[in-house]
Amino acid sequence: MTTMKIIYTYTDEAPALATHSLLPVVQAFADKAGVAVETRDISLAARVLAAFDLAPDALAELGELAKTPEANIIKLPNVSASVPQLKAAVAELQAKGFAVPDYPEDPQSEQERAARTAYDAVKGSAVNPVLREGNSDRRAPASVKSYARSHPHSMGPWSPDSRSHVATMTDGDFRHSETSVTLADAATLRIELQATDGTTTVLLEGLGVEAGEIIDAAVMRKAALEQFLAREIADARDKDVLFSVHLKATMMKVSDPIIFGHVVKQYFAGVFEQYAQELASVGADPNQGLGGVLADLQRLPAETRQQVEQAIQATYASGPALAQVDSSRGITNLHVPSDVIVDASMPAAIRTSGQMWNAQDQQQDTKFVIPDSSYAALYSVTIEDCRAHGAFDPTTMGTVPNVGLMAQKAEEYGSHDKTFEIAAAGTVRVVDEAGTVLLSREVEPGDVFRACQTKDAPVRDWVQLAVRRARATGAPTVFWLDETRAHDAQVLAKVHACLAEQDVDGLVIEFLDVEQATRYTLERVRRGEETISVTGNVLRDYLTDLFPILELGTSAKMLSIVPLMQGGGLFETGAGGSAPKHVQQLVKEDYLRWDSLGEFLALSVSLEFLGEQTGNARASLLGTTLDTATGRVLEENRSPARKVGQIDNRGSHFYLALYWAQALAAQTEDAEAAALFGPLAASLAEAESVVVAELLAVQGHPADLGGYYSVDKDKTDAVMRPSATFNAALASF
């Protein structure tokens, strides 16, 4: 017997706070269908505690559950921790009395090395790859799309004279150095560096691979990167545009902080040359951003520190001007590696007239530096399109659902354990147990070597999912694959073999590289048409932010389904992040503007999936009526506003409960359910003005959560459930 259970993940920041308010509603309703909704804490704080055996390892438990047919997991956004975030969480846990060690910057002892290994496993995007035992099906639900068309979000106008542009490398990057092979047989591989002095260093051993698996190797060359950055910094100064860099230091937790460090060092080249010894003496690490370097300077003698700080200010003055993250606090694009994440920052800029903010808090044309050229054309073509045709119009634009390859840590997003900053010149080789060299790349000191894996079963599953979505929608379906790229050529061979086994009669299926696919898709978007994108793991991430942000104003409103390969379901609540600024506003003035629409959508499909899997008709009914209620929340404008004095996240949860109860009371297919929910619908409707008044009354004052990464449950419940009337109605139900 399949258990009637849904796991609702407790995560971080704004979505975690929203859970304190929404979950009691969900549990009360689901209980009437015999469905238990249980939480598992996979927040950053909980994962740190689990790493040192101070809490259950809920993530490992869910990783195992995801490999079973019973899995029904609702996954909310979580923090992909950068080192500064990780250190802040550790400090908070230590202050609460938990015996977790400091994060060791430069581990010396065996104990410190063990702690560093444990923390490195928690760092970056450590959650999603464990749960994603399937591929991704992301699309804008019809109700959300129609709402966006009738209530368009703001889109900054584009000038045909815009000087904004993408700068990317033309050689010496991962894209241009990639080599790839498909293995005929299962094997155990090792990655080794054969230095020019004759020594061999094993970088990784015991790497198990399956028959049919694709292995890639590529190198980001330090010398080429430095030359490229120096050239682009000078060019931004000459063109008088803002300089900005767009990486993904959260997910690409080994390679991208190193690349980010090179950007910091190149921009402040004079400072790092003149004060090399002084900076080294306090362990200043550009990979942690300018913010980290400035913090380290505090340990220098006052006079020296002032000299370095003045040199930094002089660099700012000579330009180019840097794009700002928070101009009021002087936080630039180069302060924190995790502040500017390419898949969120580029769509935001494209939506804002192709501009970013300068130190004077004005929008300005910008150079968007995306060093590796693998996917940069997505953004350069979109910028060219907006320059030629103006901003997109949400009232008429089409839609771009995505079928994304991500199961079993496919491609770059599973490469962290196979990414190395090279210490000595030589050749990095990928070798099997018989000593056969499968792949090799020449390297110099400071180069970043990266190997990726893509297993056969996920590719087959991805192609089948693409065909199912093409069949269900009738929309043209584009595989974003570039036959001139080593990895993509291997994938294409598999795709063609899989399609030969499928019924594709009457389907329109195209194969285009990133540049061609972007042009083709944008032309159709401007005509109001639907185009399915079938992409690898990185483009899945990029496209499911870019198009939802342009179409809907946010990627948090996407339906994000992961049909797990063993038959279960993972339902992700949108494709956005965890909104730290929303938490800051809540703490300051007890107003949470987080929109739980993503949770509503995911819960609806989760309940319908459970109903189908188990024959629980009432669970299915809860799902369909929740969809109806969600539509009403949108149409009657009950989503959170932005400012104090209007309803926020908590108010939207009250209206969802009201409309959901009313939909259940009004339906005729389950008379018992109608009778059960009728009284609740009546009492909530009667109490509406009282509940809204209670919710608004708390706004405008600071709120105490008793923590940030590790909040106090009772305090946070009190903050997030301030309406005694609403709480009593749910409790008596």
What residue ranges belong to the model's regions?
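Short, charged, amphipathic alpha-helical segments
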Residues: 674-682
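A glycine-biased, small/acidic residue-tolerant capping/turn segment at secondary-structure junctions
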Residues: 692-708
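Short, charged/polar, low-complexity loop and linker segments
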Residues: 660-669
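Structural helix-adjacent loops and short alpha-helical linkers that scaffold large soluble proteins
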Residues: 615-616, 669-675
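Extended, well-ordered protein cores
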Residues: 2-261, 270-494, 498-520, 524-650, ...
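C-terminal accessory extensions/subdomains outside the catalytic/core fold
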Residues: 711-733
